[in-house]
Amino acid sequence: MAMLSDTIYALSSGAPPSGVSVVRVSGPLTRDILVKLVGSVPAARHVSHRTIRTRNNQPIDSGLVLFFPAPNSFTGEDVAELQIHGSRAVLAALFHALGDIPGVRMAVEGEFSRRAFENGKLDLVEVEGLADLIGAETEMQRRLAVEHSAGGLSAIYDSWAERLTRARALVEAELDFPEEDDVPGSVSDAVWADMAKLRSDIGDHLAAASAGEIIRDGFKVVIAGAPNAGKSSLLNALARRDVAIVTEIAGTTRDVLQVDLDIDGYLIKLFDTAGLREADDKVEMEGVRRARVALRDADLVLLLVDMTKPLIPDDLEQSSPHVTVGTKKDLTEVNSGRYDLQISTATGDGLPELRRLIGDIVERRFAGLSMAIPSRQRHKDSLAKCLAALDVALSQTDVNLELRTEQLRIAAEYLGRITGRVDVEQLLGVIFSEFCIGK
């Protein structure tokens, strides 16, 4: 990461050409830049229409200029935003003018958010939530990201850290001043009862992490069945485009194909797999192996059965959770007792019902779930280590209190690593590299 003393600039809006582009500037030279480019510093947080000029007083463009003085800005530094016409030529001219000013340079990925973190405007969970909000494609992803970026999840972790700090303070006070009247007598029982409750709270919270990961990364639905059961046809029908090759030749699908769907606000990752059968062809054998791997990782299996020649591979009947879908409804009489649903990809019959069924299954899984849940592996890892330290502190009742208190300190440190309250330098490059240049 380059020096935070530099003044940086970048395009913060979408790639040109566009109707409007927003260029953000942050750093100690922001006021000087505004004087050079637009003649003076606009009133704080008020929109001002200005002509932007080069150092030779040649006009670049006219647009809206805003100034946000430190510390009341996104980065905590002096920040300016220039809203100009979004042509490549205008942006190139403005960037050339900015780059000519000593001490001013183009920002690197995530540098504005990095400065916001360094200046205490955002913690790491809020930074990650902001990245997720920018990348959100479904309604549930948006809700999860808003909760995280607004500090809802951080507030939970901060409250837990405060409970750990208070517990350590009370135990250490009893250790240091056992004879003092103003130290509550025998606080241990109350402290450890609260730590047991905290351990339970964190355990319940960690158990919800899989839901957070599914909302963020997608609910995996695997289409499986015997060869020619209509798996690829269903993938194409649900995707509303030709993703998979469809032929009457058994074994056409040799690999796992995937498309993303938005069903009722949830990201659904839909996988088409090779037909499950004993194969002699090495390529098809590999496809079958990959299909079985996908089945193991599935959140839901759509078990397709060709109703004109019903055949279910033996190991698929035990797939759980699964929905049995009868296919080729247009070619045979419906056997409603055997199937959860019957469809025809040729006529579209049953496809809206299948989409609703998938949506209902996902909705039931997340019904009543708070969005203040962990959604990243690093959150889970730190929470698990926090729990492990609490387990040691709670279980080792026969050891010195100082040793048990040390485990509380370790537990608090792992909570602090989630929000960045403790040293997490090695994580920062990874986290901020997820952002675009202008964020």
UniProtKB/Swiss-Prot annotation:
Keywords, comma-separated and alphabetical: Cytoplasm, GTP-binding, Hydrolase, Magnesium, Metal-binding, Nucleotide-binding, Potassium, tRNA processing
Residues annotated as binding K(+): 228, 247, 249, 252
Record: residues binding Mg(2+): 232, 253
Cofactor(s) demanded: K(+)
Subcellular location: Cytoplasm
Record: residues binding GTP: 228-233, 247-253, 272-275
Family annotation (SUPFAM superfamilies): P-loop containing nucleoside triphosphate hydrolases, TrmE connector domain
Gene Ontology CC terms: cytoplasm
Any one of the GO BP annotations: tRNA wobble uridine modification
InterPro entries: G_TrmE, GTP-bd, GTP-bd_TrmE_N, GTPase_MnmE, MnmE_dom2, MnmE_helical, P-loop_NTPase, Small_GTP-bd
Cofactor binding remark: Binds 1 potassium ion per subunit.
Residues annotated for (6S)-5-formyl-5,6,7,8-tetrahydrofolate binding in this entry: 24, 81, 121, 439
Residue ranges constituting the TrmE-type G domain according to the UniProt record: 218-363
NCBIfam families named among the record's database cross-references: mnmE_trmE_thdF (TIGR00450), PRK05291.1-3 (NF003661), small_GTP (TIGR00231)
Family: Belongs to the TRAFAC class TrmE-Era-EngA-EngB-Septin-like GTPase superfamily. TrmE GTPase family.
Function statement: Exhibits a very high intrinsic GTPase hydrolysis rate. Involved in the addition of a carboxymethylaminomethyl (cmnm) group at the wobble position (U34) of certain tRNAs, forming tRNA-cmnm(5)s(2)U34.
Record-given protein name: tRNA modification GTPase MnmE
Organism: Rhizobium johnstonii (strain DSM 114642 / LMG 32736 / 3841) (Rhizobium leguminosarum bv. viciae)
Gene it is expressed from: mnmE
